[in-house]
Amino acid sequence: LSAQAQTAFFTEDFETDGLNTRYTAPEGSGSDGDQDYFDRISNDTSDRTHTNVQGTFYWGAQDIDDGAAAGVKPASLLITGIDITGRSSLQFSAYFAEQRPEASGEDDIDSGDFAIVEYQIDNGGYQSLIAFEGGGGNNTPFFEDTDFDGTGDGTQLETAFAQFTKSIAGTGDSLDLR
């Protein structure tokens, strides 16, 4: 993921382990090595078959309330203190994908599952930036939630990572993402 004005000035690609140095996972992180994870992972098992991966590693989440993963739901990843002093027209850009379908052939996003990125400038309170939700009900795919109403109504996530770019309103000295 990156924050940028005209050119990228901050990038976190997860290629090296930055847990507790470049980013934190306050509720915890971990993996059972296969299907339950909230961690920096790669396509190292038959369960993860993503394409268009930007490098080798990425931050992934699957069945995060399992004890082998974060053990709680929701779980968060924080990147704080990004220096934005003197920058304007900020943008957030990141690649997102969904691991699907599961072995049964069904999608595995259930009612209440979501992924959301929020930002705050100078500790001014978090604002929604981009969200993904199920399409309603259980065993649905993830869709972008374009109006933040809790229902996916936009672009459907696929197993191929796709880039999403959003504008960040405001200016200041320090940007936090979660």
Where are these regions (language model features)?
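Short coil-to-beta strand junction motifs in C2/discoidin
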Residues: 104-116
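Short beta-strands within extracellular/lumenal beta-sheet-rich domains
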Residues: 67-87, 160-165
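Terminal, low-complexity interaction segments
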Residues: 11-13, 134-178
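Extracellular beta-strand-rich recognition modules
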Residues: 14, 88-101, 115, 162, ...
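C-terminal segment of classical bacterial N-terminal signal peptides
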Residues: 1-4
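Extracellular glycan-recognition surfaces and repeat-rich motifs
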Residues: 6-66, 73, 138
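Surface-exposed loop/edge segments in extracytoplasmic proteins
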Residues: 21, 123-131
